[in-house]
Amino acid sequence: MLILLPMSPEIASYNSIQSPSDKIICDKLLQKMDAVLTNAVSKIWHAHPVWFIDDNPIAGYSKQKAGIRLMFWSGASFDEVNLNIIGKKFKDASIIYKSPEDIDLLDLERWLQKSIEIQCDYKNIVKRKGRLDRLK
């Protein structure tokens, strides 16, 4: 049984417009992200739920053709085999969930902890003309 913690109305609205299976995935991600990222602020950013620490994006999810994509802005530095690194310029990494059963809660919690401990400075990337520095 899925027990939901209090959530932002905007993220609840985002989750509610997903297909039934995708909504379950989104709700599971939201519950775990809110439970682990207690010092983060969550909001809809560029039309998707994103969690921030000190105005720096660290994690979020979005609907893609392939499923629900969970992304970590500094995930390329996590050294995790199940996270896919697509680009070279930025330090993001992600995983696609096609069904609620795909979510490994132990992996998810570990990745969320790493998103707190390992952060690149996306907040100031424009000021630094595209250079991405590590904060933590």
Label each region the model flagged.
Residues 1-136:
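Charge-dense, helix-prone N-terminal extensions
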